[in-house]
Amino acid sequence: MKAIGFNRPLPVSNPEALLDIELPEPELRPHDILVAVQAVSVNPVDVKVRAAHTPAAGQYRVLGYDAAGIVQAVGSEVRHFKVGDEVYYAGAINRQGSNAQLQAVDARIAAKKPRSLDFAQAAALPLTAITAWETLFDRLDVNKPVAGGANALLLIG
């Protein structure tokens, strides 16, 4: 399969910072879904991992954590997804990323894509939504549920 990866942390201005590569199709673990990636987003974690990680000799690292796509196969323990489902997710930092045609993702961190969103919109949500949630409820300790929250608008910045 085609992917975009790197084999050493070069400055982004270097033409070899990101490379078009060919990789074998990912193998599924029991809880995985195989996703044909339709859209991805770029997050600060992509930049940080690329700057700090050097793959083993002859290996490539594929970046990309937020993505949306179509399920192509399911692992033996997957119960909530089937082939053809449209999904979105934030992948795992310890696995190959979403900047590839196919990505193996733990189904327990994926969700069915809302019908009201296209693939690009869905791919833009996972890490930003997690960041907003953690900021509001873990850092600022906003009580859940917020009384009158349905009528509130939070503007930051």
Q: Model segments located where?
A:
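Conserved hydrophobic/aromatic beta-strand scaffold that supports enzyme active sites
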Residues: 20, 25, 68-70, 102-104, ...
